[in-house]
């Protein structure tokens, strides 16, 4: 089963947009993500609907970030991309006749609910400015390593 990568891809795009003070065209984003510009426009429209980006048509136009990274949580973006399913596993039969299957389903359902709530809480508490900071730390470390290799 293929993983849904809309969340990570849009987080990737938003962080790049925050670093560069220019509009990003759908073509530019599609090249970055190695996908179709139509897919980009469809997904970015969800971010626009939630007030994270805006778009300008015509020459010099494109998508621009209009909300501060400190005001956007991972959960906000998760919602904006359509709340993709978190788990690929589940119960085959929601109304089993077998009591063994019933208790298995109940145990799994409870575990899934608890795990999903834990993840949702984590997504809500993590702002995009933290990711931007973490990137900067990694970037600085990368540059320092490259410079030390040259000396």
What residue spans do the PLM features occupy?
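Generic alpha-helical structural context detector
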Residues: 12-15, 75-79, 121
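Beta-hairpin "wing" of winged helix-turn-helix
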Residues: 50-66
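Conserved segment of winged-helix/HTH DNA-binding domains
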Residues: 69-94, 112
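Extreme N-terminal segment that seeds HTH/winged-HTH DNA-binding domains in transcriptional regulators
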Residues: 1-33
């Amino acid at each position: 089963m293929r993983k849904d990568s809309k969340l990570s891809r849009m987080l990737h795009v938003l962080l790049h947009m925050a670093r560069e003070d220019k509009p990003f065209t759908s073509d530019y984003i599609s090249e970055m993500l190695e996908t179709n510009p139509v897919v980009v426009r469809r997904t970015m429209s969800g971010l626009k609907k939630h007030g994270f980006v805006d778009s300008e048509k015509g020459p010099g136009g494109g998508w621009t970030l209009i909300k501060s990274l400190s005001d956007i949580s991972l959960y906000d973006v998760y919602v904006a991309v359509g709340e993709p399913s978190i788990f690929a596993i589940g119960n085959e039969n929601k109304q089993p006749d077998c009591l063994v299957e019933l208790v298995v389903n109940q145990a799994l359902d409870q575990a899934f609910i608890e795990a999903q709530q834990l993840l949702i809480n984590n997504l809500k508490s993590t702002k995009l400015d933290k990711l931007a900071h973490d990137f900067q730390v990694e970037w600085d470390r990368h540059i320092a390593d490259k410079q030390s290799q040259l000396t």
